[in-house]
């Protein structure tokens, strides 16, 4: 069996997109297994995750996102920008659209000005212990690693995120990130961001839950870091977030957070399902 796919990325955070707007292509029970196979960088197409375009009874379209390990997540900031560009380009929705996600219905605007740009109303960041969720108050919680002490702060921007503010990002973030990601404090696990603030510019490196490694960019993480930094009085309400993959612009208001960034459609192709490796 052969199925069509599209390869996209938002600031280097890359995805395989499957269009199920006209009907189911990959059965629900098969989706985790399929995603693990197609996202494998040696035996599949290779990606940080997979996007599924589906019809919605509540909005213009329905967004589904799976991490490369096959787990489904409520939201992905870079993913929803790519998704939105695709559905506008294919004529499934207009340039102002409403998208159903597991994190709620989001409003977006797609613009074509020197490339494709998508502005996402990400909703209001949540800081409550039960909203993150966390077993204890983690606002300023101290973590010790390799003889050093770090303070962590958490927010939920569709998925849980921890921010660790540092003076330098020139170190291997993975060991400490994994310690925090798998801490019993976070019953659902968490994404972990390391951030360096310079005025209203924040440089961020993110370890993503479900990918289980550092990615080139994370949209929900960028929003979370900006919201936490603003709450701590480190930045203003408009912030440039610099990731390894590129720039995201974050704007915070009393009621919501807006994220603006690019969305690239790299190529379209055909998958031969019988050639994928499902045993890895």
Curated annotation (Swiss-Prot):
Pfam families in the record: DAP_epimerase
Organism: Archaeoglobus fulgidus (strain ATCC 49558 / DSM 4304 / JCM 9628 / NBRC 100126 / VC-16)
InterPro entries: DAP_epimerase_AS, DAP_epimerase_DapF
PANTHER family referenced in this protein's UniProt entry, alphabetically: DIAMINOPIMELATE EPIMERASE, DIAMINOPIMELATE EPIMERASE, CHLOROPLASTIC
EC main group: isomerase
Subunit record text: Homodimer.
Keywords: Amino-acid biosynthesis, Cytoplasm, Isomerase, Lysine biosynthesis
GO cellular component, one term: cytosol
HAMAP family: DAP_epimerase
Domain of life assignment: Archaea
Gene Ontology terms: biological process: lysine biosynthetic process via diaminopimelate
E.C. no: 5.1.1.7
PROSITE patterns hit by this protein: DAP_EPIMERASE
Pathway info: Amino-acid biosynthesis; L-lysine biosynthesis via DAP pathway; DL-2,6-diaminopimelate from LL-2,6-diaminopimelate: step 1/1
Record site: Could be important to modulate the pK values of the two catalytic cysteine residues: 161, 208
Official protein name in the record: Diaminopimelate epimerase
Keyword Isomerase included in the entry's annotation: yes
Similarity field: Belongs to the diaminopimelate epimerase family.
Record-annotated disulphide pairs: none
Active site, renumbered: 76, 218
Cellular location(s): Cytoplasm
Function recorded in the entry: Catalyzes the stereoinversion of LL-2,6-diaminopimelate (L,L-DAP) to meso-diaminopimelate (meso-DAP), a precursor of L-lysine.
């Amino acid at each position: 069996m052969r199925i069509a796919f599209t390869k996209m990325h938002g600031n280097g955070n890359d995805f395989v997109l499957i269009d199920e707007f006209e009907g189911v292509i990959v059965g629900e029970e098969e989706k985790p297994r399929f995603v693990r196979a197609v996202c494998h960088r040696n035996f599949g197409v290779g990606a940080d995750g997979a996007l599924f375009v589906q019809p919605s009874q509540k909005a213009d379209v329905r967004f589904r996102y799976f991490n490369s390990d096959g787990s489904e997540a409520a939201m992905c900031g870079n993913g929803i920008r790519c998704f939105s560009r695709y559905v506008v380009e294919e004529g499934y929705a207009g340039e102002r659209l409403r998208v159903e996600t597991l994190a709620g219905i989001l409003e977006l605007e797609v613009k074509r000005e020197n490339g494709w740009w998508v502005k996402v109303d990400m909703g209001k960041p949540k800081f409550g212990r039960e909203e993150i969720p966390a077993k204890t108050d983690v606002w300023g919680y101290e973590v010790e690693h390799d003889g050093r002490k770090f303070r962590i702060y958490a927010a939920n921007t569709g998925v849980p995120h921890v921010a660790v503010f540092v003076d330098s990002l020139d170190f291997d973030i993975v060991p400490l990130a994994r310690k925090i990601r798998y801490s019993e404090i976070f019953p659902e696990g968490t994404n972990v961001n390391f951030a360096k603030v310079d005025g209203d510019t924040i440089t961020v490196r993110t370890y993503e839950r479900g990918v289980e490694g550092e990615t080139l960019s994370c949209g929900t993480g960028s929003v979370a870091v900006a919201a936490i930094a603003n709450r701590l009085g480190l930045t203003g309400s408009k912030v440039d977030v610099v990731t390894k993959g590129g720039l995201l612009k974050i704007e915070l208001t009393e009621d919501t957070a807006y994220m603006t960034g690019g969305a690239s459609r790299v190529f379209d192709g055909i998958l031969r399902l019988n050639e994928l490796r499902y045993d890895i």
